[in-house]
Amino acid sequence: MQADFWHARWANNQIGFHLDEINPYLMRHLSRLRLQAGEQILVPLCGKTLDLAWLAAQGLEVLGVELSEKAVSDFFEEHDLHPEIDQLDGFRRYRVAGITLLQGDFFALQAEHLAQCRAFYDRAALIALPPEMRERYAGHLQAVLPTRSLGLLVTIDYPQAEMAGPPFAVPDEEVRGYYAGGWRIEELERGDVLGVNWKFLERGVSWLDEAVYLLERG
């Protein structure tokens, strides 16, 4: 899956992964990340999610990373925000109070960019990637995060043979495999969500689960 794929999805407004509401799992479980006002949270492959503004409204410093320039521009335009724009190590950096978005390749992210980061929130990053990229993504994320970190991860699982992703099925054992090295993993929620996901129903998917994990290292 190449960068051109995601640029085309945004250019053609094929963004079914974008939610027009704050993610309810985030609202329910943000407190489990034990963040204090002013601490930084990373949102990888963030798109233009409404969760960015909501997290900032909770008093957090939000750092999003997104490949698509259109997604980043749309986020600020739709929130009537006027960011300062400059360059940072190959990224185009957009900044307003409480929110910094780095537009560019996630795999160019370096540990020094996350030196102040306390936690991450992944709702649509891991499940957006095919298997060969998921392992690379999870490895890079762990390499650049500070040693002591927490994470809130949302995944879906379904019979992958019944539908081509994205979003892709990421079963529980895969999550635990990616984060086996020094992370404590707690499943916070798991439920059947097939009935409220028409895209999966239309394609004949027989079951669909959504799960939420708390990850902690250090």
UniProtKB/Swiss-Prot annotation:
GO terms for molecular function: thiopurine S-methyltransferase activity. The keyword Cytoplasm applies. It catalyses: S-adenosyl-L-methionine + a thiopurine = S-adenosyl-L-homocysteine + a thiopurine S-methylether. Disulfide bonds: none annotated. It comes from the Bacteria. Its EC number is 2.1.1.67. GO terms for cellular component: cytoplasm. Pfam families: TPMT (PF05724). The keyword Cytoplasm applies. InterPro entries: SAM-dependent_MTases_sf, Thiopur_S-MeTfrase_Se/Te_detox, Thiopurine_S-MeTrfase, TPMT. S-adenosyl-L-methionine binds at W10, L45, E66, R123. Keywords: Cytoplasm, Methyltransferase, S-adenosyl-L-methionine, Transferase. GO terms for biological process: methylation; response to metal ion. It is found in: Cytoplasm. Belongs to the class I-like SAM-binding methyltransferase superfamily. TPMT family. This is Thiopurine S-methyltransferase. The gene is tpm.
